[in-house]
Amino acid sequence: MTNLLIAYTGLALMIILPGIGSAIGVSIGSNATIGALKKRPDAFGNYMLLSALSGTHGLFGFAAFFIFYSKTVFTPDITPFAATAVFGAGLIFVVATYAAIRQGQICANGIAEIASGNDVFGKTMILAVFPELYSILAFAAAFLISNKI
């Protein structure tokens, strides 16, 4: 039973950690949008895309959750190895939490610059993708772990 609890804790981390990061990152971008709308309301489409970008990290966590939860190992007879693997895969997503928050900050800076009249939407999108890579790596690592249990 303890092994099953460890495994389910890992599953919960796959949702909780990137979900928290995405919520914080999106709110950082959205807060910047509120201020930017006062200066340039015509750029709302750009603001909205940049604000929403941090939400993708939560999707990576959910995808990993779905992959692991579809495995048939979640029974009271789960092995310590499998339980620890699921927990470790969930813990990996602390990377996505941090990446989502930092991506939100990058997007907020881009939003502020667009509001100031600078044409930096494309460049901001490019720079904001860099933290995304680390969430993708976390997802890839979780996927590889899932293939070993």
Predicted segments, located by residue:
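Hydrophobic, small-residue-rich transmembrane alpha-helices and their short perimembrane loops
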Residues: 1-149
